[in-house]
Amino acid sequence: MSEKLIPFFLECGGLPPLCYLRYLAIQSVRVIVTTAVIKRRQVAALQSFPYHPNMTRTWKIRDGALTIGERTLVMGILNVTPDSFSDGGQFFSLEKAIDQGKRMFDEGADIIDVGGESTRPGNAGPVSAAEETERVVPVVEALSKALAIPLSIDTTKSEVAKAAIDAGAAIVNDVSALRFDFYVADATAQAGAGLILMHSRGTPATMHRLPPVADIMHEVTTSLSASIKMAERRGVKRETIVIDPGIGFGKSQEQNLELIENLDQLRTIFPDLPILVGTSRKSFIGRILADEAGNPAPPDRRMYGSMASLAAAVMKGANIVRVHDVRAAVETVRIIDAIRTNSQNPA
């Protein structure tokens, strides 16, 4: 007999069945009360970090900050590479890259993300740090002087990150979330720059061959948690961190859609961190928009699908969207933000 039951049996004059029922009833009430308390605490935590437009918080970046939550921010993609999946070679020259950066600024970009190495699935191999630096630093240097918006450097290499920060970048966007080079965190912390940690699996050369994981939400949240802890251990302040679930990086089409659909779960787990989502022109959009013969839509015919997917992501809690088509994205999120603001402040 359990020692916990003896006092109940003595109280009831030695009638075990009745005492046992009383014991079960008391335990059930305790469980219900405890569950209610936990749920109230969870709701309170979520209410402390909502993502609807009329509540804001600050993302600290180098020499400044960006307001998160007031409206959705748009990050324009500027690839200075010969082989990116969507626009490789278009802006490889310094003059064309600068012109494109200015064009995105005029179209309403809040941030411009400069990348010097293609991360498309199946990419042949990494670019050396020296070559990548040579590609991005002149562009960052020129645009930081010409534009009044922050620049981000899209790199997984600490050497490139440091050089770009010295040239004027305020944010580091690491698609490996420190898996390839954890010294990226050191370079970011020392400069007080913003740090975007994106979930990915494998490398650009192998990610498309990896077997799918059973639970993609668990995989993403667990991996990002580990990267966040590593960044903080190396001196990165939490208020400088943004997370990205990594749509299209080592995921199946179904998993990409699942991540977008369940983005609010990521918000629940990381309520204080801004979320960036990049679906722009990704291959899963091309496959969904395939023609009758099954041929995927090419990158230049994926804009409308990209806008639909980013709209869904914003409605689920994305704070920043990373896009090729800046004007279309700016207009799309403006409408979404208006709808959400209206729903929070009905007439």
What is each model feature region?
Residues 23, 32-34, 42, 50-51:
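Short, positively charged and aromatic/hydrophobic N-terminal segments
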Residues 67, 73-95:
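N-terminal binding-site loop/beta-alpha segment at the start of enzyme catalytic domains
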Residues 106, 227-240:
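Phosphate/pyrophosphate-binding loops at sites that engage ATP/ADP/AMP, CoA/4′-phosphopantetheine
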Residues 61-63, 86-100, 119-150, 155-159, ...:
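Active-site-adjacent loop and "lid" segments of alpha/beta metabolic enzymes
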Residues 99-115:
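Catalytic domains of carbohydrate-active enzymes, especially glycoside hydrolases
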